[in-house]
Amino acid sequence: MQAYILINCNTGSETNVIAELKELPEIVEINGVWGKYDVFIKIRTPDPNGVEQILKRLRNHPDITDTFTMHVLYGQGGSIDQES
C-alpha cells in the first residue's frame, strides 16, 4: 500500500518533526514544503492497516497539528522517467 501524506506542524517544529519521521522505515520520501502544508511524505506499507498505524502515530505527535492523506490508486499513472 502506498500513500502520500501532507502534514501541518506547530510553527518552528518542522525541522525536528522531519528528523523524527526520517526514523520510520515506512517513510520512503520526506520533504519540507511551502504552502498550506509544512511537510510532504510518501509511505509504503504491506497493507492498509499499516497506513492506519502510521496515521495514528502522526496524529498523536505533539507537534503535528493536521494531516491530509492521499491513497495511491494502482493502475493509474506511475513514475515518469525523463531523459535530459
Regions of interest found by a model, annotated:
Residues 1-84:
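A compositional/biophysical signature of low hydrophobicity enriched in polar/charged and small residues
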